[in-house]
Amino acid sequence: MPRPSHRLLLSAVVAALALTVALVAGQASARSNAQITVYAAASLTDVFPRIDPGQKYQFGGSNTLAAQITLGAPADVFASANMTLPNQLNARGLCSKPVVFTRNTLVVVVPKANPKNVRSVYDLTKPGVKLVVAGPGVPVGSYTLQILKNMNLTSSVTKNVVSQETDVREVLAKVALGEADAGFVYSTDAKTVADKVNVIKVPAWAQPKVQYGICVVTRSNNKTDAAAFIAKVLSKAGQARMLSYGFLPRVKPAPAKKQ
């Protein structure tokens, strides 16, 4: 039986190597387009899927999501309604250094019928007003307490709190359904049920600094794709989408210079 020539052997080796390279490249390509899991604040429920509809999203109270990530939940990206929680995760080595990706403001919402005739934040001190807020561990709950402190209304308003919810959407739902007379929510959330609630503005001087932070979760097996998602959120198109949903620019514009 004739032996195969060196040329044939070399050709076979080259073909095998080419096949291996193709398979590896295919696997790498698949990884670069992997679907990631984004844990995001409830207030981002409507906008994030519009920025990138191809990802898997878990929305909820930022504090709850942070606790789940701490316990090993399979998140690739964490987007919080404050900077405190992602900074805490970063300090523990559980996520990358967070960056601010948007800002927001708070408002008071009341049912369209407004049975208690609430017209300002000060009206929340009226006897019998049923106020619903988010819990103090939830970013919007912490911001609410800051507003009341800034307005020197903490004790006179908190006595009317009848329920503390786990995220901003739960607060909004109770007011929209008429189960409460008023609630503190983000201005962006109020717009989602404009046909069911009226909005009462919080004075600008009483507004807290509401910044949203985003980071890559350390345990993620898709860090490249997670970073690409964050880049998409920070991109010109991503920021334009955030603005279209009522969020504020990630960097507060400098005040105009006096002429």
Name every feature range the model reports, one short phrase each.
Residues P2-L10:
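Twin-arginine (Tat) signal peptide motif
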Residues R3, L23-D52, K56-Q58, N63-P74, ...:
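Exported/periplasmic ABC-transporter solute-binding proteins
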Residues L10-S11, G61:
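Hydrophobic alpha-helical segments, principally membrane-spanning helices and signal/leader peptides
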Residues S11-A22:
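Bacterial N-terminal signal peptides
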